[in-house]
């Protein structure tokens, strides 16, 4: 029987990180085992189940500042992070090259509406959005010299804010609108609703620049849709709503892309310090069913199915 995933309890601010303390000792023990390549411990199954429950039915967020990761050399850091991601879920491709683990760093690129680039390869501000996978996992190898704060917003609180301030927009959130596939799908664009809420499932998927860039394909957004997106942005970006953290080496963050949104402030590097995060997208067997309109985005919509990520140009062996 499929588990019901109703709208979770809303939250605001950095208090959301308090629940993560309950996982700290177990995660450090797990990282030590992965580093030493020892066989799995029987207690790890319960830890994994608890983590997924927090991500699916709780806050949708986990923050862990790992002393073990902080002390590792680069090759061991990457190996332990990769092993952790494979332990937690099923990795899905993060780009058309079929890579499953990618460094988030500034390569000097600039993302623009008519000349799209992957945001994680720029130093630009990234507005609140959700990724193309059930879960996003990030680990900091090196923080930026300046900027690069990471922000997380409760989707349930965003909707509660809209319900109180602009209830007229709520029906529009459930209507499909054009979503640019950014040259990473089988078509130019898809028609996808921002909000799906039924007695069995809850999903808020939002990445406004993908709605705006459909102009590349000769489309335009109706004035009413633009007004609705403006109202949604206002609810998302309220200063007392989001949690915020400054990355430091060894810091690990997990977010559920169906129940939270995340953002990044602009950053700058110098020769001595360059921002570098490791990023992995995961499919979770514990997650919810999605609407059929999500098929162009995630390829499968059944609860717990292997889904999400970007379909590679050529299939490569999974790591």
Regions found by a protein language model. Name each.
Residues 1-45, 49, 57-62, 70-71, ...:
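Active-site environment of non-heme Fe oxygenases that use a 2-His-1-carboxylate facial triad
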Residues 75-82, 152-154:
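"Short basic amphipathic alpha-helical interaction patches in structured regions
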């Amino acid at each position: 029987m499929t588990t019901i995933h109703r709208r979770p309890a809303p939250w605001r601010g950095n208090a959301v990180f308090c629940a993560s303390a309950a996982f700290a000792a177990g995660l450090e023990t797990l990282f030590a085992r992965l580093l030493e390549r020892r066989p799995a411990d029987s207690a790890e199954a319960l830890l994994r189940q608890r983590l997924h429950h927090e991500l699916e039915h709780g806050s949708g967020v986990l923050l862990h500042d790992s002393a073990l990761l902080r002390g590792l050399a680069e090759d061991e850091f990457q190996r332990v992070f990769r092993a952790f991601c494979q332990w937690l879920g099923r990795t899905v491709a993060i780009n058309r090259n079929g890579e499953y683990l990618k460094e988030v760093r500034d390569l000097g690129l600039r993302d623009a509406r008519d000349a799209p680039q992957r945001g994680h390869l720029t130093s630009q501000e990234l507005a609140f959005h959700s990724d193309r996978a059930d879960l996003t996992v990030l680990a900091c190898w090196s923080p930026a010299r300046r900027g690069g704060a990471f922000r997380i917003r409760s989707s349930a609180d965003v909707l509660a804010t809209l319900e109180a301030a602009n209830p007229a927009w709520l029906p529009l959130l459930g209507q499909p609108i054009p979503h640019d596939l950014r040259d990473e799908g089988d078509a130019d664009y898809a028609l996808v609703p921002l909000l799906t809420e039924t007695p069995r499932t809850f999903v808020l998927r939002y990445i406004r620049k993908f709605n705006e860039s459909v102009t590349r394909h000769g489309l335009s957004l109706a004035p009413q849709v633009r007004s609705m997106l403006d109202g949604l942005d206002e609810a998302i970006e309220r200063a007392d709503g989001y949690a915020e953290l400054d990355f430091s080496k060894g810091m690990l963050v997990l977010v559920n892309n169906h129940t939270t949104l995340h953002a990044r402030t602009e950053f700058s590097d110098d020769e001595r310090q360059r921002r570098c995060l490791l990023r992995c997208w995961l499919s979770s067997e514990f997650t919810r069913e999605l609407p059929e309109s999500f098929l162009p985005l995630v390829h499968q919509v059944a609860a717990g199915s292997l889904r999400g990520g970007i379909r590679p140009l050529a299939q490569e062996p999974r790591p």
